[in-house]
Amino acid sequence: MEAEHITQSEARAAVERLYAAFAQKDVNLLRQAVTSDWEYLPEPAGFKAGPDQMIPIFAEMAAALPDMRIEILDMLTQDNRVGVRAEVSGTQSGPLMGIAATSKPVRFAIHSFHEIRDDRVSKTWHLEDWLSMFRQIGEVPRGIGSGA
């Protein structure tokens, strides 16, 4: 498949809309930022492609990190692909992945690669440094690291 030709500024704008939607936990803004068949990899279990797969995740993040901020540290573009290195910060004020609120500040890295189609993000490969966050709050979700 041939890469769509877009400018660096168009690619950056598309990805910045996506991160604004995540930071604001705004599904309507996400629907404007991504294609209707947007793939988020690794895909949340039991969800089909598209922006609505983020509804429960946004709800959990709104409760867990209500003051969440996302700072884009680096953005690299090539053709219709954008690589992002960013940092999430906030206070774990509500349950997150089964861990009760700790009221502790957290800061962790995220790394993503995005594919752009029709001025929207059509595919995202995304990794978060959850281990760093778990170390900061002093707990891991039940079942992780138990050898089970």
Map each language-model feature to its residues:
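C-terminal and inter-domain tail/linker signature
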Residues: 1-148
